[in-house]
Amino acid sequence: MFNVRQLIATTLLLSCAFAAQAERLKDIASISGVRSNQLIGYGLVVGLNGTGDQTTQTPFTLQTFNNMLSQFGIKVPAGSGNVQLKNVAAVSVHADLPPFAKPGQVVDITVSSIGNSKSLRGGSLLMTPLKGIDGNVYAIAQGNLVVGGFDAEGRDGSKITVNVPSAGRIPGGASVERAVPSGFNQGNTLTLNLNRPDFTTAKRIVDKVNDLLGPGVAQAVDGGSVRVSAPMDPSQRVDYLSILENLEIDPGQAVAKVIINSRTGTIVIGQNVKVSPAAVTHGSLTVTITEDPIVSQPGAFSNGQTAVVPRSRVNAEQEAKPMFKFGPGTTLDEIVRAVNQVGAAPGDLMAILEALKQAGALQADLIVI
C-alpha cells in the first residue's frame, strides 16, 4: 500500500520549499496511545547519619522495618515497639515509565520522605516494587540517592537548610520488569493529537499529508485530532511514522491572550493582541500615615504622671497621569510603548488591561492566574 522509499524521496523534495516558521509535526502533535505511564511505590531508605524518621512518632516506619526483617527470617522480640531507628526513613518512590520501555531497561526515579526525616542525604533505597494504576508491578527500584539539599543545626538551636534535603533522585534507579501493553501496532489507522487544538493547524496537517501520500489518507476528526491511514506491518509503520513526524507544518496563529499573574506581577502579552480605539488615564493615590507621639509632662507638685500622647498625621496625594489614546488596531509594541511613557508599574498595567477588557477595547482573552 505504501512505498517507503518513494515517500522519503518525495519528502526531501518538498522540504526545500518549507517556510522558516514551519514546525515539525512531532513538535506540535503526539501519537494517540504513545504515552508515558506513572509508577509509584513505598519503601525504606537506610544508611542515614542520624537524620531518619523518629519512629516513635511515625510507627509505620517501624512496622515496615519489622516486615522487612521478617522476610529474612528475623523475628523482632515482642515489646520492642519503642525502638528508635535514627538511620531509617519511610519514603515514597515515583517514576515515569516511557512508552515502549522493555524489561531490562532502566528509568530515573524520585524518592521523597513521607515521615519526619530531616534529610535523606547519604541514604540508600532498598528494593522497592513500583506499581501502575492497575496494581501490577512494572519496575523494581534500588540504589544510592543523590540529594541536592542539606540541613545543618548548631547546639544553640541555630539552623540552616539549603534546597530540599528530604527528597532526592536515583538516575537509572529502577529496572523495568514488565512492558506496558500498547495498541501502536493494532489497526490500519493512527490518530495524531495536537498539543494545542486548532482547526487551522489540523487542516494544514491534513493537506500536507494528503499532498504527500494522496487524497483521503488523512482526515481531520476535530480541531485537536487527525486520523491517518497506516501500514499494517510493524516495520513499515515505523518507517512511515518517521516520515510523517518530520513533515514541516505551518501551525495556525494562536488565540490572542493576555496572561496576568497577580501574585508575582508578571504580565505576558501575546503577539496578536490588539486594542480598539480607546483613551486611558491612570492616576496613583498615595496615602501616608505618620506617627509623631508627644510626651505630656505634668506640672510641678501636681501629683500628675508623665504620659505619651499619640499624634498622627494623614496625608493623601493624587499623582496626575497624562491621558494616552489607542488608535484602531493598536499592536503589542504600541501598547507597551504608550504605557512606558506614563511610567506605569506592573500593577498599574494590570489595572489598565482589566479596564480595557471591561470596556470591550481589548481584543484578546484576559487570563488571570
Curated annotation (Swiss-Prot):
Alphabetic keyword roster: Bacterial flagellum, Periplasm, Signal
Stretch forming the signal peptide: 1-22
Any single Gene Ontology cellular-component annotation: outer membrane-bounded periplasmic space
UniProt record, GO biological process: bacterial-type flagellum-dependent cell motility
Keyword Zinc tagged: no
Pfam family, one: FlgI
Quaternary data: The basal body constitutes a major portion of the flagellar organelle and consists of four rings (L,P,S, and M) mounted on a central rod.
Function: Assembles around the rod to form the L-ring and probably protects the motor/basal body from shearing forces during rotation.
Entries under HAMAP family matching the protein: FlgI
Protein name, entry field: Flagellar P-ring protein
Name of the gene this protein is made from: flgI
